[in-house]
């Protein structure tokens, strides 16, 4: 469960290392974001010469959460960290590589480019 002021790791090579959630998109008063949700975030830590800079406001999709996700078959899936992938205006990833596993719920949210770049889909 991601909400405002939650800090997330960045799971791509866009240049950002850590982002902070500003707003959860979807609905008028949506409070929490889960895997597959799009958020608006501020870049808190970035590497020099990256595609995104520190302080920049970006959109990102959540790909991993520490809070477990219950699937329809009854299984629970949880990860070691909260992570997101930064998106551009067309909802494609800014980076060209994805690091770490990605949850299958990202596929259900129609982010196929992220699924194809991910090394592992859990």
UniProtKB/Swiss-Prot annotation:
GO biological process: translation
InterPro entries: Ribosomal_uL14, Ribosomal_uL14_bac-type, Ribosomal_uL14_CS, Ribosomal_uL14_sf
One matching Pfam family: Ribosomal_L14
Database matches in CDD domains: Ribosomal_uL14
SUPFAM superfamilies: Ribosomal protein L14
GO cellular component, one term: cytosolic large ribosomal subunit
One GO MF term: structural constituent of ribosome
UniProtKB keywords: Ribonucleoprotein, Ribosomal protein, RNA-binding, rRNA-binding
Position of the signal peptide: none
Complex and partners: Part of the 50S ribosomal subunit. Forms a cluster with proteins L3 and L19. In the 70S ribosome, L14 and L19 interact and together make contacts with the 16S rRNA in bridges B5 and B8.
NCBIfam families: rplN_bact
Function: Binds to 23S rRNA. Forms part of two intersubunit bridges in the 70S ribosome.
Family: Belongs to the universal ribosomal protein uL14 family.
Name of this chain's protein: Large ribosomal subunit protein uL14
Species whose genome carries this gene: Helicobacter pylori (strain G27)
Chain's gene name: rplN
